[in-house]
Amino acid sequence: MAKKIIAKIKLQLEAGKATPAPPVGPALGQHGVNIMDFCKKFNAVTADKPGMVFPAVITVYADRSFTFELKTPPASFLILKAAGIKKGSGEPNKVKVGKITKAQVEEIAKIKMPDLNARTLEAAMKIIEGTARNMGVEVVD
């Protein structure tokens, strides 16, 4: 028989830097999960990708065991990294804060493809371009 799921927790954590401090500790502690065990496993899996941010979906079972699944880094994080900027524009329609090329958009779309609800690479690229536009990042040829 399958284990009974009591919670699904979503966190965005930097690779190799999960610690029992907030936000990890309180989120997992209230469900009785061994926080250090999660931190060690997460850090081991993401150790080879320093500086990246990963969304993790942690499934907590009734016996206090857990499994976690890593998603691809957020599109906004990948766009900021590609454009070489710290944060997006406060007024994206008026103030442009950076530029990325179509090739960079395609690269980001390839990375994000498993998590996007797009069937083709072109559709995924349009999603990424829209995200970039909403952040005040210009897409150039």
From Swiss-Prot:
One cellular component term from this protein's GO annotations in UniProt: cytosolic large ribosomal subunit
Q: Which SUPFAM superfamilies match?
A: Ribosomal L11/L12e N-terminal domain, Ribosomal protein L11, C-terminal domain
Xref: PROSITE patterns: RIBOSOMAL_L11
Matching entries from InterPro entries are given as: Ribosomal_uL11, Ribosomal_uL11_bac-typ, Ribosomal_uL11_C, Ribosomal_uL11_C_sf, Ribosomal_uL11_CS, Ribosomal_uL11_N, Ribosomal_uL11_N_sf
Checking Pfam families in the record gives: Ribosomal_L11 (PF00298), Ribosomal_L11_N (PF03946)
GO molecular function per UniProt: large ribosomal subunit rRNA binding; structural constituent of ribosome
Q: How is it modified after translation?
A: One or more lysine residues are methylated.
Entry's Gene Ontology BP terms: translation
* The keyword Transmembrane helix is annotated on this UniProt entry: no
Q: State the UniProt keywords alphabetically.
A: Methylation, Ribonucleoprotein, Ribosomal protein, RNA-binding, rRNA-binding
Family matches, as SMART domains: RL11
Q: Where on the tree of life does the source sit, at the highest rank?
A: Bacteria
Q: How does it assemble?
A: Part of the ribosomal stalk of the 50S ribosomal subunit. Interacts with L10 and the large rRNA to form the base of the stalk. L10 forms an elongated spine to which L12 dimers bind in a sequential fashion forming a multimeric L10(L12)X complex.
The role this protein plays is:
Forms part of the ribosomal stalk which helps the ribosome interact with GTP-bound translation factors.
Q: Which family does it belong to?
A: Belongs to the universal ribosomal protein uL11 family.
Q: What is this protein called?
A: Large ribosomal subunit protein uL11
